[in-house]
Amino acid sequence: ADVVTYENKKGNVTFDHKAHAEKLGCDACHEGTPAKIAIDKKSAHKDACKTCHKSNNGPTKCGGCHIK
């Protein structure tokens, strides 16, 4: 899918896979062969999204990703 929306009580998070892949390349998120990644609160806030956003000038405040 090019765009995935994660439903969340603090506001849905829309992930534009195509835009991320074009900017960062597959190996920024995927190890080995690209496959679906399970994202939970910990991985989104610590292990994956927020850490990468800090390094690549992406949004790091709640409202930057969680849209009500």
Curated annotation (Swiss-Prot):
GO terms for molecular function: electron transfer activity; heme binding; metal ion binding. It comes from the Bacteria. Binds 3 heme groups per subunit. Keywords: Electron transport, Heme, Iron, Metal-binding, Sulfate respiration, Transport. Heme 1 binds at H17, C26, C29, H30. GO terms for biological process: anaerobic respiration. InterPro entries: Cyt_c_III (IPR002322), Multihaem_cyt_sf (IPR036280). Coiled coil: none annotated. Heme 2 binds at H20, C49, C52, H53. Heme 3 binds at H45, C62, C65, H66. Participates in sulfate respiration coupled with phosphorylation by transferring electrons from the enzyme dehydrogenase to ferredoxin. This is Cytochrome c3.
